């Protein structure tokens, strides 16, 4: 209850404020605290489906033919409450899908269409997503009908694909299998700006230097998907906009040809909406009144639908026939000269000079009215930028080629964050594998696992070498876009074999041994690398008095150079690894924050992170063999010594440099150990210390080993989608 609520004669029976209102959070009181909440998202407490619900199994029961029929019908069934432009919702549905998928960025794999996050803040209320709430409501009868067999994430992505089909494009295919989340992600960094559409140079700007966009961002402004359609900071200049386009599309793994295809293909159909006063629009969905029921941007002053809709503020269609897949975009863009104009809403747009009457698109509600087509500053970049122009000319001259390139690029856009093809479900999954899917051939399970382990144990490899190599192979996994991991053994290929973080000299030595063992059996190198890590852990556990077998699932395959897109793997290169106590260089972000981000991408919880780091320290897996954080007299033994000594009050901690500390005996002041911020945070952060104390207890030595093995196995199997 609010303290400003009307007094109705009695006191509110609910304790004021704290539980239901947004009060000052711990992170606001203590901004330097670690936000461990990012490790504890999307659990059973927020998911209404129950622990036994498996969407990937449920969607296999979906009647795709019936769904497709219903989706095609929806496209042309205009609703009075939100009219379809020209009687077809295709343009709206394409924008819906595009703006869901278009949040993906390759730097950290976050964003994209894979979770249905467009339903939640902040994305559902971004200025670039004005009126997409209406598109989702139009889809609700479909979602309601197919229920648990169809996620919102799949439906939103599918809507654009069906829209293109209904307007004449031969699509490349579609895969189901995206699982919904039930609250906004807490781990995705969208920028530091304090206002929507803040221009460059404003407080918290994402730009520095000569228009260098901050990593990992892939949009030019807070609240946009890609670029500002009016120009850089709203100032039209197609060549400057071309620079922004190239950067943003590269950051979502698109080359120049794919960029032109997606820009042109996205604007071949549909229109922009700006026929009115944007100031008359109500609040966005998250800020709207309760009676608006999740609708935002309502125009309660004017009609606000059909020809009077205001979305981006730009007004008009790009082509003569906006409900047909054709070559009209390039025909108008390249055959006419264009001049700057202002839309009725006051937005900059380009309009053709002396356009022929037959090239004018008709009004969305009255076909007897002809209107002027438009281009955005981004469209003009396709004509003015020399490289984009070459591609545009080719597409203009060869409609079939344009259609093929676009269909493939659209498939890539809407599936980029789904991971390898093994995760694809449905009758329309293309047979052809794409290199951006990071293909891995099937591996063998027909070999004697124990015999391979015996050969590994008999080699001269140390526990540290075996565990470190297996870890390095697996740590590249990102749950965000399902890339990386141990499957494929790409650690033996360029570029990974040469990454500084993989210690090329040590890696080469270890791989020479493990590849020889693999060659002498039917096992893949990928399996042997993981098995070697398991052997090392078993030896370290035995040294601590625990005889155990680390779980193992065979069947990993070995990728080849031909299956590996070198450039796309650069973003997976580790530039830090708290688990091996290593930083490639000093960064503005603290070492413990970097560790937290990597942990979230790997899909680990806070206690799994805790037990893994404590175990890897005492095993001796530090990068370069450093002794920082190795808080034990028995290196190579899987003991709980790290936590015992970390929580021991007989020691004090003193800084000796940037990210370096000495642990000194309180009585003698003699240096006992050295450590980094990543080590110390498990004693300083109250939550992590609580976990550290659990593992330091005298009665939890076995629990520590068991939990370490469980977390280790989770990392090794993170990319084994064939086991799910």
Swiss-Prot record:
It is an enzyme of class 1 (oxidoreductase). SUPFAM superfamilies: Heme-dependent peroxidases. Formation of the three residue Trp-Tyr-Met cross-link is important for the catalase, but not the peroxidase activity of the enzyme. InterPro entries: Catalase_peroxidase, Haem_peroxidase, Haem_peroxidase_sf, Peroxidases_AS. The keyword DNA damage does not apply. The record marks 95 as: Transition state stabilizer. GO terms for molecular function: catalase activity; heme binding; metal ion binding. There is a cross-link at residues 98-226 (Tryptophyl-tyrosyl-methioninium (Trp-Tyr) (with M-252)). There is a cross-link at residues 226-252 (Tryptophyl-tyrosyl-methioninium (Tyr-Met) (with W-98)). Binds 1 heme b (iron(II)-protoporphyrin IX) group per dimer. Keywords: Heme, Hydrogen peroxide, Iron, Metal-binding, Oxidoreductase, Peroxidase. Belongs to the peroxidase family. Peroxidase/catalase subfamily. Bifunctional enzyme with both catalase and broad-spectrum peroxidase activity. This is Catalase-peroxidase. The lineage of its organism: Bacteria, Pseudomonadati, Pseudomonadota, Gammaproteobacteria, Alteromonadales. The gene is katG.
